[in-house]
Structure formats: structure tokens, C-alpha cells
């Protein structure tokens, strides 16, 4: 491993530079990767995430279209729009920003996206391909975590990897990617009886529970690699992760900060999936 603090901003910058070259090759063939981002409602955090994604697209030369719709929009209206984008050759990737308003089914909406344009990697077809070890698109956050571990020279073959959190977006696909890399994987959920004991077994500990401070330094094996996927607001309004950074950093061999760790990598891998989709469409 390299530095104790795993800098996701630095790693993502390297990936974006590589993507610029791939985009330039596509544009030399009169192909410009295109990403459509659909935002329903006025969720402030979603607004920020969408702006960050659009800005990242511009940096690497991806054409992006952002469509904002009111919360009163119906699910059928959104499904109709997705169907139209599925057939648009200028759009290689479709991203529906979550969460959606309560009257919409995220499952039905995600399943309406063509698996060939599902650059978030959430469609059931892409989840199945990931499960069988032949992914078409890897979900962006787990994909970014794997790239971070690779950039730090972390060997996963035979390693004990523990994931705190079992969501469809992070925990479950993260487990599949770690298994494919040769790790022995344990997933902890809200019913896990001895979370601290499980966490202390980890050579690589990935925390994605959505709860600030659920893991602290007393739960970490000395020298372990700690990846904090969480993003929360502390009592002071500042961003914080699921790991108590102060105590964890004293024990861990390497650790990601929040912000500046996994977040930039998630966006970088969204761009990578979009470029990959464009390259496939050009074959």
C-alpha cells in the first residue's frame, strides 16, 4: 500500500484523464458519448449530485442532457420519457437520479431503462450478469471501490473482506466483485449479532450502512484497509462517513476520508460506464 489516506480525488483524476483519451478516439470517428440524467422533484442533495455529474461529463468530453421534472410528474410520464431515450442513438447512458418521489416505483423505473444504457448498473439483467461473473456494467460505487483498492496495490486474493451494509446498490454488488477478485467475503446487515467482532476480522473493511459512526477504531484490525462509503450530515452540518474517522485512522493501515474518498470514484466510474456504452455501440 502507498499512503495511509486513500485519496479518491487523485485516483479519479487519473481515470478521467484516461477517459478523455478514449472520448477523443471516439470523437475522431464522429461519435460523442451521450448521457441523459433525469431528475424528478426538488431534493437538494439530488440537485447537487446531478450538477457534479454534469460537470464531470463536461471535463472528459461526454455530451450530457439534464432533464428536470416536478414531483407531480406521473410514473407513466417518466416511463414514456425513458422509452424515448432508449431509442435515441445520441444517448448511450440513462441515469435516473434516486430517490424518486413516493408515488413512483424505483424498481419499475430502473427496469424500464435499456440494459445497454443502464450505466448505473442497477437493471436486473446487469445484476444477473454481475452475479455470474460476466458484468456488462458494474454499479458505480462498488466499481469505484475496486479501482481504489487497485490503485493502492491492495491484494484481495485470500483476504478477509467484510462489508457492513447489504443494499442492492453497494453491499450486494460489492460482495460479488470482491468474490471475483478472490477475497473471502462476509456481509453484515442490521440483524448481525456481533458487528464489532465481524468487523475486527477484516483485512479489508467496507462500510456502507448509511449510519454515521457505526464503525469506530475499536472495531478495526490494526493495519486493515478501511473504505468508508457512507455520506451523512453530522450534528454540526458537516459531511461525515459511516466510520468515525478520528479513531479509525489511528488503527487502520489505510483509510478513505469523507468527503474526498469514494464519492469522486463513483462519478468517475459513471463516466467510464458511459464511455464503455458508447464504445460498444460503435462496434
UniProtKB/Swiss-Prot annotation:
Keyword line: Amino-acid biosynthesis, Histidine biosynthesis, Hydrolase, Methionine biosynthesis, Multifunctional enzyme, NADP, One-carbon metabolism, Oxidoreductase, Purine biosynthesis
CDD domains attached to this UniProt entry: NAD_bind_m-THF_DH_Cyclohyd
GO biological processes: L-histidine biosynthetic process; methionine biosynthetic process; purine nucleotide biosynthetic process; tetrahydrofolate interconversion
GO cellular component terms, semicolon-separated: cytosol
A Pfam family hit: THF_DHG_CYH
PROSITE patterns linked: THF_DHG_CYH_1, THF_DHG_CYH_2
Taxonomy, superkingdom: Bacteria
Entry's EC annotation: 1.5.1.5, 3.5.4.9
GO MF assignments: methenyltetrahydrofolate cyclohydrolase activity; methylenetetrahydrofolate dehydrogenase (NADP+) activity
Residues reported to bind NADP(+): 165-167, 190, 231
Pathway where this protein functions: One-carbon metabolism; tetrahydrofolate interconversion
InterPro entries given in the database record: Aminoacid_DH-like_N_sf (IPR046346), NAD(P)-bd_dom_sf (IPR036291), THF_DH/CycHdrlase (IPR000672), THF_DH/CycHdrlase_cat_dom (IPR020630), THF_DH/CycHdrlase_CS (IPR020867), THF_DH/CycHdrlase_NAD-bd_dom (IPR020631)
Catalytic activity: (6R)-5,10-methylene-5,6,7,8-tetrahydrofolate + NADP(+) = (6R)-5,10-methenyltetrahydrofolate + NADPH; (6R)-5,10-methenyltetrahydrofolate + H2O = (6R)-10-formyltetrahydrofolate + H(+)
Subunit structure: Homodimer.
Function: Catalyzes the oxidation of 5,10-methylenetetrahydrofolate to 5,10-methenyltetrahydrofolate and then the hydrolysis of 5,10-methenyltetrahydrofolate to 10-formyltetrahydrofolate.
Family: Belongs to the tetrahydrofolate dehydrogenase/cyclohydrolase family.
Protein name: Bifunctional protein FolD 2
